[in-house]
Design a protein with these regions (language model features):
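Conserved MFS/SLC helix-loop-helix module at the cytosolic interface between two early adjacent transmembrane helices
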Residues: 12-48
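Cytoplasmic helix-loop-helix junction between adjacent transmembrane helices
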Residues: 56-94
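Cytoplasmic membrane-interface "Motif A"-like loop-to-helix N-cap segments
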Residues: 23-33, 220-233
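Helix-to-loop junctions at the C-terminal end of transmembrane segments
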Residues: 13-25, 212-223, 306
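Extracytoplasmic gate region of multi-pass secondary transporters
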Residues: 161-202, 206-212
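A late C-terminal transmembrane helix in Major Facilitator Superfamily
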Residues: 274-311
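C-terminal transmembrane helical hairpin of 12-TM major facilitator-type secondary transporters
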Residues: 225-270
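Helix-loop-helix hairpin linking two adjacent transmembrane segments in secondary transporters
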Residues: 90-137
Length: 337
């Protein structure tokens, strides 16, 4: 439920956040979002009940949706027409990198001091980030030419493309989440200890921190994003479907991270192709509203498959199917273009 409290604002506020871009700057909105993340941490520090923890998660969720939308827009503004896929990959991979650092650092802080110190550290980090963005960030000069009067609403063709791009991103992320949720169970069924199984599955997340940027660089250099995407999806699907062959588990997890998850930046680059620059703030709000609505049910469907069959492999087959439909959705996006 606390996880849901964090994600709920994304469904409700993504579109209004897109509206907000008409009235204030990206810099101020990101600063406010980071401050909300810090405030959520403060509420968690002083929380003494479930309701207070839920409130902390909601406040953090508000900050998350604002920063997600406008960090994406800021990167798009700076790198549109340049090495956009690479830049988007670096942005996207910063999230699992932060999670990985938190998993290590926060556990150490909690063991050395108190569990509240993890929230203290995260809140301080967000405050420093807010200060840095507010004091240092400047909109690129070329963006000023078309963002001084950002427009609300999207023409029908841009709305269609934005929803399709969101579908591609949502299916891709949903497949990854299902893999993280049920991959270890497949390995445990094959004889691994739970701790070892979780460590092997996590290898994909570690290597994708580097493979995403490399894949984005290759896409920007050779200008073949669709070919690269389909090759990566094929590798990802193969690694998922072969996961029950647990003697190859390490290699399959590495393959999934190195190849299957590599095209994240390539997919996020679709956002700039779906909408005009002066409608980007609102359009990315639409993009993430659709993303949250589409991706949220996937873990529940995977859980239902597991509960119904008692076999952890079926959710993995579901994840592979989601990756297959990523390719289909991308093809429809190109057709609609």
């Amino acid at each position: 439920m606390l996880i849901g409290a964090f994600l709920l604002p994304g469904v409700v506020l993504a579109l209004p956040c897109g509206f907000a871009g008409r009235y204030t700057s990206d810099r101020l909105l990101v600063t406010v979002g980071l401050v909300c993340l810090a405030l959520g941490g403060v509420v968690a520090i002083i929380a003494t009940s479930f309701n207070m923890f839920a409130l902390a998660r909601i406040v953090c969720g508000i900050g998350f949706v604002v920063t997600t939308i406008y960090f994406t827009k800021m990167v798009a503004d700076w790198f549109d027409g340049k090495e956009l896929a690479t830049a988007m990959a670096v942005l996207v991979m910063s999230w699992p990198f932060g999670i990985a650092m938190g998993q290590v650092g926060h556990v150490w802080l909690a063991a050395l001091f108190d569990w509240r110190m993890a929230f203290v550290a995260a809140s301080i980090y967000c405050c420093l980030g807010a200060l840095g963005v507010f004091c240092v960030y400047r909109m690129p000069t070329h963006a000023n030419d078309h963002t001084h009067s950002p427009q609300l609403g999207l023409p029908s063709n841009e709305l269609t493309l934005t929803l399709l791009a969101s579908l591609v991103w949502a299916l891709f992320n949903a497949g990854y989440i299902v893999y993280l949720s049920f991959g270890a169970s497949v390995l445990v069924n094959g004889g691994y200890e739970p701790t070892g199984a979780a460590a092997i599955i996590s290898l994909a997340s570690w290597v994708m921190l580097f493979s995403g940027a490399i894949c984005g660089q290759i896409s920007d250099r050779f200008k073949k994003p669709d070919t690269i995407l389909y090759i990566c999806l094929a590798g990802g699907i193969a690694s998922l479907l072969l996961l029950p062959w647990t003697q190859f588990a390490v290699g399959l997890s590495l393959l999934f991270g190195l190849i299957g998850m590599a095209p994240a930046g390539v997919i996020m680059a679709l956002t700039t192709q779906a909408m005009a620059p002066h409608r980007r703030a609102f359009g990315i709000g639409v993009f993430f509203t659709s993303y949250f609505l589409i991706s949220t049910p996937a873990p529940g469907i995977a859980g239902w498959l597991f509960d119904t069959t008692g076999i952890a492999y079926w959710p993995i087959v579901f994840a592979a199917t989601l990756f297959l439909f990523v390719g289909v959705a991308n093809a429809v996006f190109r057709y609609a273009q």
